[in-house]
Amino acid sequence: MNVYESLQTVLLFVVLLAMVKPLGTFMARVFQGERTILSPVLAPAESLLYGVCGVNSEEEMDWKRYARAMVLFNLVIFATLFAMLMLQHLLPLNPQKFPAFSWQLALNTAVSFTTNTNWQAYAGEQAASYFTQMVGLTVHNFVSAATGIAVAIAVIRGFARRTTSALGNFWVDLTRATLYILVPISLIAALVLVSQGVIQNFSAYQAVSLVQPVTYDTPKRDGTGSPVKDPTGNPVTERVTAKEVTIPMGPVASQEAIKELGTNGGGFFNANSAHPFENPTPLSNMLEILLILLIPFSLTYTFGAMVGNTRQGWTLLGVMLLILLASFAVLQGVESGGNPLVTKLGVHGANMEGKDTRFGLAGSSLFTVATTGTSCGAVNTMHDSLTPIGGMIPMSLMLLGELVPGGVGSGLYTMLAFAVIAVFVSGLMIGRTPEYLGKKIEVREMWMSVVTVLAAGVMVLILSGIAMISPSAVAAMANPGAHGLSEVLYAFASMANNNGSAFAGLSANTTFYNILGALAMIVGRFAPAVAVLAMAGSLAEKKYVPPSLGTLPTDKVPFALWLTLVILIVGALTFFPALSLGPIVEHLTMTM
């Protein structure tokens, strides 16, 4: 990295870490029902919402009621968005007269935005009306993020409380996450983005004639949208001449802010945050990275504050930061080394294919690890154009379970599940009953933490295997061989771990990927969430056990390193064979 890139990277993390304690403390006060600086303005609105919806804010739920409320709410918002997509052509604010989505695409998209995945098998500016983008997708960006935060807060209460079955009230946590955290920060962020050039309007698309016609080759597709291939398996292209260009408009800034803050990731435009109307300047790029990482990192301090030991939160943050920075260093290194095939031709330099020069290599690499280390999935770089090892980095961050720092809420509770596993394994090694935060870790907690950690991974491997033997799934791959496998593996890793980014060479808008992708997103979202709530319910009922001489300190550097090792070992044992057949083989093929 040059001096400029180094300074902007250091500045970003300095600002981020400086905001962790204030925001983490604020969130702890919000969810503990304490008065905050926003209470005079928002408390009346909060009370009004409870009254209108018939919610008793003083009533608390056990883990089963909490989980039922969470699942029921998500079922309702899924059905609402599905209906909206199927009736898009009848709804207002559709100046381009976009038709309704097909039922398979509507199913996949509704599941995607309900589960905080934001996988998009469509191009936003070519398929979704302003009404769909605003009332459907943007609203879901808020409530899906609030759902993740609510579950994380319930899990924190499970560790903090003693001899009780109560984990809080889902409806209260959902409301407070939206009103006090997501809406205010998104409002400020949207205004800053507008100042940088992100558009916000309701104008019709603008058709502009080109000074000189442009001729280019584009992949040829059949009636199902899959790429046409020649007998050798390579894609067939057709030549197109463009005489005018259509410039899309729309209310982008309001969606862009919550897209990043809620680690949602679904772009208003097909190019996502590489589009100049979504991410026009280096400053907007740094702001979007900050928004992506802000809440997941700050929730670790919220955890420490609510359990009464902030060092516990800093320990988890340290593990997240260590893996994230190591991933950034590797990605930056391999991409700056260039494409091996191009280097063999005597052309030296960084691999800038698929990257925007206004962000530079460091700005692109940092965005890539931030968006895949969380469950965001927004991109300012085309991940399919990364070198094989470069592409393996974001893929691996997803396969680890989206926990460095993970999605809003989901990252923290997945990390806590790994912490329980790490404590349990260490207890077995020294012959003592494992304890974490004064709670004994027993069989029930272990089972639930294992389900939390492995549910998404099992779906990735099973569905990727099915795709490799399904003719329709293979036909959707634009690239043969190891890279084609990488595209499929990346797709299911992204969907099952609720990320949403993609290797763009895969034609995802097919019946196979729409339906099985929806299944992966549902299991990847709700199996861990329900399992971790069950674990929290069990922990909340336990008595507090004072630490003794044999208790493993979980707020010290040795435990942080042990937790890091456990995360990497579980990831390696689960996915190394699959990665060996994809990006690793591709890298060896290119360098031999």
UniProtKB/Swiss-Prot annotation:
InterPro entries: KdpA (IPR004623)
Chief site of localization: membrane
Protein's cellular compartments: Cell inner membrane
Bilayer topology: Multi-pass membrane protein
GO molecular function terms listed in the Swiss-Prot or TrEMBL record: P-type potassium transmembrane transporter activity; potassium ion binding
GO BP term (any one): potassium ion transmembrane transport
Positions of transmembrane segments: 7-27, 71-91, 136-156, 179-199, 287-307, 314-334, 411-431, 449-469, 473-493, 515-535, 559-579
Record key words, sorted: Cell inner membrane, Cell membrane, Ion transport, Membrane, Potassium, Potassium transport, Transmembrane, Transmembrane helix, Transport
SS bonds (residue pairs): none
Cellular component terms (Gene Ontology): plasma membrane
Domain of life, per lineage: Bacteria
One Pfam entry name: KdpA
Keyword Transcription regulation listed: no
Family matches, as NCBIfam families: kdpA (TIGR00680)
Task of the protein: Part of the high-affinity ATP-driven potassium transport (or Kdp) system, which catalyzes the hydrolysis of ATP coupled with the electrogenic transport of potassium into the cytoplasm. This subunit binds the periplasmic potassium ions and delivers the ions to the membrane domain of KdpB through an intramembrane tunnel.
Binding partners and assembly: The system is composed of three essential subunits: KdpA, KdpB and KdpC.
Protein family per UniProt: Belongs to the KdpA family.
Protein name: Potassium-transporting ATPase potassium-binding subunit
Species the sequence originates in: Geobacter sulfurreducens (strain ATCC 51573 / DSM 12127 / PCA)
